[in-house]
């Protein structure tokens, strides 16, 4: 494999994981903070808030996993080689 393609693939994989983690990380922090605030305001709605929070956290985490999959494809099954 060409060393330039190999180096570009490693950099692209690093960017894929890094950028894919920034958005969901910020979103998960905001969602958890708002959920805690909502539970503090209405303790009787805790079950509904928690269920909605966990579902939304799972969807946000899926974006990070997609970035990891792209990085693994670039590193081990490089389509540009």
Swiss-Prot record:
Bilayer disposition of the protein: Multi-pass membrane protein
Q: Does the keyword Transport apply?
A: yes
Regions that span the bilayer: 7-27, 57-77
Return the annotated site residues (Reversibly protonated during proton transport). Answer: 61
Alphabetically, the GO molecular function entries are: lipid binding; proton-transporting ATP synthase activity, rotational mechanism
Read off the SUPFAM superfamilies from this record. F1F0 ATP synthase subunit C
Subunit composition and interactions: F-type ATPases have 2 components, F(1) - the catalytic core - and F(0) - the membrane proton channel. F(1) has five subunits: alpha(3), beta(3), gamma(1), delta(1), epsilon(1). F(0) has four main subunits: a(1), b(1), b'(1) and c(10-14). The alpha and beta chains form an alternating ring which encloses part of the gamma chain. F(1) is attached to F(0) by a central stalk formed by the gamma and epsilon chains, while a peripheral stalk is formed by the delta, b and b' chains.
Q: Which family does it belong to?
A: Belongs to the ATPase C chain family.
Q: Report the protein name in the record.
A: ATP synthase subunit c
Species of origin reads Nostoc sp. (strain PCC 7120 / SAG 25.82 / UTEX 2576)
* Phylogenetic classification of the source organism: Bacteria, Bacillati, Cyanobacteriota, Cyanophyceae, Nostocales
